[in-house]
Design a protein with these regions (language model features):
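Short beta-strand to alpha-helix junction loop
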Residues: 93-104, 128-137, 175-196, 203, ...
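Flavin-dependent oxidoreductases
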Residues: 51, 211-326
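Dinucleotide-binding Rossmann-like beta1-alpha1 core, especially the glycine-rich loop
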Residues: 84-164, 170, 293-294, 315
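Beta1/beta-strand and adjacent pyrophosphate-binding region of the FAD-binding site
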Residues: 33-48, 66
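Helical element adjacent to the flavin cofactor pocket in flavoenzyme catalytic cores
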Residues: 174-235, 239-246, 430-441
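C-terminal catalytic lobe of FAD-dependent flavoproteins
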Residues: 336, 341-446
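Glycine-rich FAD pyrophosphate-binding loop
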Residues: 57-80
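Glycine-rich active-site loop/strand segments that organize a redox cofactor
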Residues: 75-105, 115-120, 160, 313-351
């Protein structure tokens, strides 16, 4: 504990400057000095922002809507760096937004993919109990799935499980036949294409620096980027993922829930071992910890990924160990909720960091259900950063969070925030979009 305290003090007092990343596009694509005016500006071009902008203009084609993204392409962060799983809705607390919107979103997603010709595979998922102590929890998941309205799930013994996955071992399993895989980055691009075709306007390389109250009574919100380009809007929807807390502060709204970035690192199975699985294979989640555990996931490109782990990222966009931002790290460590969470999950966090450095330890996690996989059968793969919302008491906020703060000034009263939309946010995106547009209609009288 004394060593941990010394490390925290060192990080808080360390002033090393983060090296500047070169080659990142920052120019505003519509040209300097543009003062476009919109009924609604959607900030954040991930899958939730893109789906919401699309739904808004589909439902209200008379509105002028902008979709604003700070990077040089859409789905740059969480939406383009994930496992690609189409979730069925088994894990989530009955009655929660996640449970309702995931089940609805899955059905909407498959219909949309078919309409647009987007490649996907309904390859299913096995949640496998490999120890006796996991079997009761597996039954609980089954009951939860039924309560959530997940279709066609069934409990299987080891013989039935092997009929689906011959190489998989376990005592019992929960089979979800409608779980699938897709490229969520491709889906996001399709949403954006729909939005543009309906008359929406997109802005890339527009990194929001501040919101100020404009003199115009008709367009009272002025959105300014890091190069002083301007967009004027009547109302704003923010879907900023990893930066949702910071963007909320810019509008005069509270920072909480605080976003803590967790990196999830994946391994690839080498191509000649990809045949070992054709479906998603997940462990029974341990209720003591907030993550689902290391699993096997086939990807739409034919490769199979193993992972992810879950380790603290040293900045909002910390995809590698060498990525860090001292100011952001100080803010993370200085947040009381993080310190409480870190104490609670210290053992788990240390083990995850060790597994990140020592690949065979991560492989051991999947050997519980496929013994043929060895350390020689994997190679380093992609990584993603999850935006985890956290309360002051250290509680991880698991459900989706959408809010507006009508009491927080002229700008805050005109903004709706998507504060927390982690997994299954992609699966739920079309359902989230419908709900968000209903909120916009109700709160902003559009």
């Amino acid at each position: 504990m004394a060593i941990a305290k010394k490390c925290v003090r060192f990080l808080l007092n360390f002033n090393y400057r983060h090296p500047v990343t070169t080659g990142t596009l920052r120019r505003y694509s519509a040209g300097a000095g543009d003062t476009s005016q919109f009924d609604v500006a959607v900030i954040g071009g991930g899958i939730v922002g893109s789906a919401s902008a699309r739904e808004l203009i589909l439902k209200h084609p008379h509105l002028k809507v902008a979709l604003v993204e700070k990077e040089n392409r859409f789905a740059f962060h969480q939406s383009g760096n994930n496992s690609g799983v189409i979730h069925a809705g088994i894990y989530y607390k009955p009655g929660s937004l996640k449970a309702k919107l995931c089940v609805k979103g899955l059905n909407l997603s498959y219909k949309y993919f078919d309409q647009k010709g987007i490649k996907y595979s309904k390859c299913g998922k096995l949640i496998v109990a490999t120890e006796r102590s996991e079997v009761p929890r597996l039954f609980d998941l089954y009951e939860r799935g039924l309560k959530n309205g997940v279709k066609d799930i069934q409990l299987m013994d080891s013989k039935e499980m092997k009929e689906i996955e011959p190489h998989c071992k376990g005592l019992q399993a929960l089979w979800s036949p409608h779980t699938g895989i897709v490229s969520w980055a491709q889906v996001t691009d399709s949403y954006v294409k729909d939005f543009i075709e309906c008359g929406g306007k997109t802005y890339l390389n527009f990194e929001v620096k501040k919101f100020i109250e404009a003199e115009s009574a008709e367009y009272p919100v002025k959105i300014i980027d890091t190069e002083n380009n301007v967009i004027n809007a009547k109302y704003v929807l923010t879907c900023c993922g990893l930066h949702s807390d910071k963007v909320a502060v810019l509008t005069g709204c509270p920072e909480e829930p605080k976003i803590i970035p967790f990196r999830g690192e994946y391994l690839y199975l080498v191509p000649n071992k990809s045949k070992l699985t054709k479906t998603n294979i997940y462990p029974v989640p341990d209720p003591r910890f907030p993550f689902l555990g290391v699993h096997l996931t086939p990807r739409i490109d034919g490769r199979v990924i193993v992972g992810p782990n879950a380790i603290l990222a040293f900045c909002k966009e910390g995809y590698r160990w060498g990525d860090y931002n001292m100011q952001e790290l100080k803010e993370i460590i200085g947040f009381s909720g993080f310190r409480k969470m870190a104490m609670k999950y210290a053992s788990f966090g240390i083990k995850e960091m060790i597994r990140s450095a020592i690949t065979p330890l991560q492989v051991m996690q999947v050997r519980k259900y496929i013994q043929e996989i060895t350390s020689a059968d994997v190679e380093r793969g992609p990584a993603g950063v999850r935006a985890q919302a956290m309360a002051k008491d250290g509680t991880l906020i698991e459900d989706f969070v959408f809010d507006s703060k009508p009491g927080h000034g002229a700008i805050g009263s005109r903004v709706l925030h998507c504060r927390n939309a982690p997994s299954p946010g992609a699966t739920s995106s079309l359902a989230i979009a419908e709900m968000v547009v209903e909120k916009i209609e109700k709160e902003f009288k559009i």
